[in-house]
Amino acid sequence: MSEERIIEKQVKTFLDIVILAILNGNSMYGYKMIAAIHRDFGILLSPASLYPLLHLLENNKLIESRSDKGKTVYYVTPKGKEKFEKKCTAYKLSIQIMTNFIKTHGET
């Protein structure tokens, strides 16, 4: 599997964390999030990949939306910020465990 494919898989697996990170301190509409992900990771998400997750995050009260000049703008809630911090801690730990595992069993 190529490095690009691994990165794409990781971003899609942890897309909720990526979205909460992008919205942390910024309000943004969906297509701008797609552009930010493309800029930061080189991955072009389809709206069909993004919008169902935005609705799920909104239903779970992790983000909220408002209409602004005909566009839906999303922003993170205090509950979303708390969830983001917890998920980041868990993600960092899992990366550390995986890195140690790879070091122990030999890198190629």
Task: Tell what function each PLM region has.
Residues 1-6:
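Short, intrinsically disordered or compositionally biased N-terminal tails of bacterial proteins
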Residues 7-49, 62:
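N-terminal helix-turn-helix DNA-binding core of bacterial DNA-binding proteins
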Residues 51-56:
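Short, hydrophobic-biased segments on the C-terminal half of alpha helices
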Residues 58-69, 75:
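Beta-hairpin "wing" of winged helix-turn-helix
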Residues 69-88:
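Basic, amphipathic "hinge/linker" alpha-helix immediately C-terminal to the N-terminal HTH DNA-binding motif
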Residues 82, 86-108:
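Amphipathic alpha-helical dimerization/coiled-coil segments
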